[in-house]
Amino acid sequence: MGKEDKQHINIVVIGHVDSGKSTTTGHLIYKCGGIDQRTIEKFEKEAAELGKGSFKYAWVLDKLKSERERGITIDIALWKFQTSKYEVTVIDAPGHRDFIKNMITGTSQADCAILIIASGTGEFEAGISKDGQTREHALLAFTLGVRQLIVALNKMDTCKWSQDRYNEIVKETSNFIKKVGYNPKSVPFVPISGFNGDNMIEASTNCPWYKGWEKETKAGKSTGKTLLEAIDAIEPPVRPTDKPLRLPLQDVYKISGIGTVPVGRVETGVIKPGMVVTFAPANVTTEVKSVEMHHQQLQAGNPGDNVGFNVKNVSVKEVRRGNVAGDSKNDPPAGCDSFNAQVIVLNHPGQVGNGYAPVLDCHTAHIACKFAELLEKIDRRTGKSVEDKPKFIKSGDAAIVKMIPSKPMCVESFTDFPPLGRFAVRDMRQTVAVGVIKSVEKNTGGSGKVTKAAQKAGKK
C-alpha cells in the first residue's frame, strides 16, 4: 500500500497536566511523523541556545502549540504520524485553552482516545483523584461517542519499571475507566517512557516481565507490545457517506466573477455539482454549481472534506456561518423550535435552573439557548432517571433538559448525525457543561426561498 492509500484516523490525547502528554505525542510525531529533518534541526538548535540541551519531544509540541495559539497556521502535517495501517492525525492535545470546546464542536470526531497516566509515586494518585482532569477528559470522550481507548502508563522509568506498580495502576485504572463507561477488556494497557522511548515504537528491554498488551472486542482479539502497535490495532471507523448530506458552514465568501461561495466541512453524506441544496435555518434552496477543495474541482465532497461550493442566485446576506446545507431531496435539514438534550454540568460555580440562558457552541453555530425546563436528573453512567423535574442541577450532575434557541438554529439528534448533535455550553469564558441532543422539535415553517436555478435543476 502506498502512503496515499492509508486510511485516516483521528486520535485525541487525554490525561492529567503532568502526565507527559506532550512528550509522548511529540515523540510519535517526531519518530513517525510529518516533521521534516530541517524543522527538527531548527528546533534542536533553538533548544540548545535556550539551554534546553536535553532536547526532548515535548519541545516539538510546545513549539507547534504556541504557533497554533498565536494564530500561525501550522502545516497540519506536523500533527500527523504514520503507523503501518493508518495515517494518524492528533486532533487536539489538552492543555490547549479551548480543549473541551474543541473536542465537542471540534473539526472532527476522534476515533480513539489515548489516556496517558503518570506512573510516578503520588503522580498517578493526583491525576486520578476525584477532581482530577483525567476523569473529566475520559468522561467527555465517552459521552461524545469516542468508544475506543488506549491507556499508556507513562514515566515507568520513575518507578524503576516495577511490575507491582504496573499491576497496581492497571487495576486502579481499569476500575476508573469502567466507571466512566469503557470496558477494560477492550482497552490495551501499555507501559511506556515517552521521554526515553521505551515501548513507544520498539519493545523495551527494561521490563522483561511485560508480556505485551491484549484487547478483545466484537471484531476479535489482538495483541502487541508497543504503543504504535496499539494505535495500529484501532478498529477502522466507518465514514458516514451513506447518510443524508449535512454540511455546517464555517464561512460564506463573495468572490468576484464567481459569486457566493459557502465553505465548510462535509460531516455526513456527499455533496456534488448539480445537486439542489437547502440551507437551514435560512430556508433557502438553490443549485450547487461546482465543488472544490484546495483550489481543485471535485466531482464529490465526502465526509471529512473541507470544501467550498459555488451557489447561484443566493446573496452573502442570505446564508451565514452556523447554517447547515443538505440535499433538498433527501431528508433536508430544518431549523428547530426546541430540542431535548442530556446535559452534563462540568464546572459551574452555582446552580443551574430553568431560565438559564448561556451560549451554545454546536457544530459551527454559536447561539444563546434557554434551559426552558429541567425534565429529569439522571445517573450519567446508566442514563437512568434519579429525579423528576429537579429545581436545580450543579457541577457533576447530568439531566435531560428542554432547550429553546434564542434565534433560528439547525441541530440534529446525536444518534442520527453525531457532529450536529453534541454541544458545549459556554459561560464566564469557559465550558460549563456539555450536551448530547436526544430529540429535536423541527419547525415546519412553510416553504422558503427557492431560486430559479433550483427550479430549473429540479425539472431536469
UniProtKB/Swiss-Prot annotation:
This chain is encoded by the gene named tef1
Please state the protein's primary subcellular location: cytoplasm
Recorded protein name is Elongation factor 1-alpha
What the entry lists under Gene3D superfamilies is as follows: P-loop containing nucleotide triphosphate hydrolases, Translation factors
Q: Using the record's annotation, list all stretches that form the tr-type G domain.
A: 6-241
The record lists the organism as: Aspergillus oryzae (strain ATCC 42149 / RIB 40) (Yellow koji mold)
Q: Where is this region: G2?
A: 71-75
User: Region labeled G5 — which residues?
Assistant: 193-195
State the residue spans of region: G4. Answer: 154-157
Is GTP-binding there in the keyword field? yes
Location of region: G1: 15-22
Q: Which Pfam families match?
A: GTP-eEF1A_C, GTP_EFTU, GTP_EFTU_D2
